[in-house]
Amino acid sequence: VLHYRFTGIDQIQGYKRSLNLKNAIYTSSFENKNVCYKTTAFLSKPSNALLLKIEAKNSHSLDLELWLSSEVKNHIKQEEMDSILLSGNAPSHVQPNYIDSDNPILYDKEHPGMAFSIYLRAMVKGGTVERGNKKIIIKNASTVLFLLTAEDGYKRYDLPFATSPKICEELCRRRIEDLSMKGYRRILKEHLRDYASVYKNVYLQLSKRRSTLPLDKRLARFREGKTDLGLLCLFFHYNRYLMIACSRKGTEPANLQGIWNENIRPVWSSNWTSNINLEMNYWLNGPCNLIDSFVPFLDFVYDLSLAGRETAKTQYHCPGWAVNHNIDIWRHTGPVGGDAKYAYWPMGGIWLCTQAFLYYQYTNDLSVLKEKIYPMTYDAVRFCLGWLQLREDGRLYTAPSTSPENMFKDKDNHACGVSYMSTMDLALIKELFSVYEEICDILKVDNEVLQKVKLSTAKLPAYQIGKRGKIQEWIQDFEEVDKGHRHFSPIFGFHPGHSIKNTDKALMEACQKFVEDKEKHTKAEIGWSCAWLINIWAKLGNGNKARFYYEELLRHSVYDNLFDLHPPLGETTGEREVFQ
């Protein structure tokens, strides 16, 4: 954590702060004793650094203390008066936050965790710099520029990480020296050019009126029922900003907390959940013109197609690759401990694979299609062909099978999570087979696997409509344990999949009945569940319903800084569909 504290400030007036989404620059300002103090900050991807500039207008009254801290064990060096270096090793092991433990964070000297380093330099104009107790002390300055960069020992999921902080320290030193020589204006210019290249591609405007109210007051008015079309636009652009901030070429994809986790034991371990969250995060990228930010997702799925081969082979005795519901930075693909209703779900890779195809659909990049998307789709298809089982009725089914995180009642009214061929399994396999056929057509491929796909598609069961008139969650007409369950998995074939067509009136009505029945038993205040409803109703052509849930999301499921209570960014693509 970077800390800076103003000293000698005791009469603050007119404090303001803002984030400009068009240039990704933060500013704040206040007055003290007739002197205006202004802070400007931005994170530069080209420079891999944070720059923060503080100015005292027409005055040499800027007195500051600067220091670094970390919840992780560390050591601090102050090599020069104007520089601080914080280094250390991550814990050797951390128990997830949902596991009770007297000693959840372990440091093992024999097996140290990943190394890391953070380097801070202060460049001062019109003042003096002194060395404090692990602090930089600045007096009588007119301007102070902070340069901050960080490195860690992570290389790749399949390579050992660095445990020596010295490697990270040296990388940080070199970068800070380069940045010091480059200068603020050049770094800023590069940042503006880089950010604009991805942000400027889309703009949404619903009203020409500009609100001057602070965000918390705008939200308060909106929650009272006041109309604010500008707030809807702001939320749309804010979500695009968040995606750009946390997912660019060379980074990991957006996970359950994005890059905004501050805890050693974060909720859900800051992992990736493949039964909705990871995919929903990236629904917006194609429709909202953020293909650059889609690259980490595509690369991640390709890695999983390699790492998941062992899971397919040893745990499912199938060719190809498989991913279950919980994935970490080391590309863990097997089931985790816990209830089968969530822990056992070998269909994650299939969903990820079908979504990866969107990259080609929005770019027409044949080389990526041939070198990455086709190989991982081919192997995902091979897994499905090996996993499907032929039953006595001549149809192919998955078994055992779960419907993500929901359960059903058996004939004795017991709660059960495992059966055969959930509707989600069926929809995913239909989608994957369709995508594979389309890719083969584009690349002029005709092989044995393609012929098996065509034969197997004809043997898949039809979607089932139950006695209550809605699409069934399982191939059998079970009653759900949780009628208001937050997942909408059974209608994947309608959205985000494509196997349920608008022309099939009976299935369309069954999907709508499923959604309406779910609405009766839930408030949909979980952010990503509400986002799913926005998308579903928009695709069903009911703009009023979609807008209702979009406004419900803003009223009940976001914090005052617009962070979602349950983070995936799925509402953005729904909003685009509502207003297009």
Predicted features by range, described:
Residues 346-382, 387, 391-467, 499-503:
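Active-site neighborhood of glycoside hydrolase catalytic domains
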Residues 1-340, 347, 358-360, 378-381, ...:
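Aromatic-residue-lined binding/catalytic grooves and analogous aromatic/hydrophobic interfacial grooves
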Residues 272-293, 389-442, 485-493, 497-503, ...:
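C-terminal capping/lid segments that line or modulate ligand- or cofactor-binding pockets
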Residues 230, 292-295, 367-371, 375, ...:
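Short, solvent-exposed positions on alpha-helices
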